[in-house]
């Protein structure tokens, strides 16, 4: 169920401060964040955010289509290595 419109989007205060500082200083370095729950705002378009996936920070270049989504959607936390191969089928 989506968040109520009267509440507005959630974004961590420390992240919005870092974004505003990067915009003011025209800094293009990635902004490192652990806040996967924060929503992407229109002010973040064009910035690179390094989102933590539990092991490392994944660089995410924000574009206009990402506005309204959460940061965690763009940094996968699980790696799928595939199912085990069937040994009987390999011999044929």
Swiss-Prot record:
One of its GO terms (molecular function) is rRNA binding. Transmembrane segments: none annotated. It comes from the Bacteria. PROSITE patterns: RIBOSOMAL_S19 (PS00323). Keywords: Ribonucleoprotein, Ribosomal protein, RNA-binding, rRNA-binding. GO terms for cellular component: cytoplasm; small ribosomal subunit. It holds the Pfam family Ribosomal_S19. Gene3D superfamilies: 30s Ribosomal Protein S19, Chain A. SUPFAM superfamilies: Ribosomal protein S19 (SSF54570). Disulfide bonds: none annotated. GO terms for biological process: ribosomal small subunit assembly; translation. Belongs to the universal ribosomal protein uS19 family. PANTHER family: RIBOSOMAL PROTEIN S19P FAMILY MEMBER (PTHR11880), SMALL RIBOSOMAL SUBUNIT PROTEIN US19M (PTHR11880:SF8). Protein S19 forms a complex with S13 that binds strongly to the 16S ribosomal RNA. This is Small ribosomal subunit protein uS19. It comes from Cellvibrio japonicus (strain Ueda107) (Pseudomonas fluorescens subsp. cellulosa). The lineage of its organism: Bacteria, Pseudomonadati, Pseudomonadota, Gammaproteobacteria, Cellvibrionales. The gene is rpsS.
């Amino acid at each position: 169920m989506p968040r109520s419109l009267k509440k507005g989007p959630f974004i961590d205060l420390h992240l919005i401060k870092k974004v505003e500082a990067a915009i003011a200083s025209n800094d293009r370095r990635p902004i490192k964040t652990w806040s996967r729950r924060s929503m992407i705002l229109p002010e973040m378009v064009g910035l690179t955010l390094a989102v933590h996936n539990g092991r490392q920070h994944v660089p995410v270049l924000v574009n206009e289509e990402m506005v309204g989504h959460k940061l965690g959607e763009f940094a996968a936390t699980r790696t799928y290595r595939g199912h085990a191969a069937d040994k009987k089928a390999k011999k044929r």
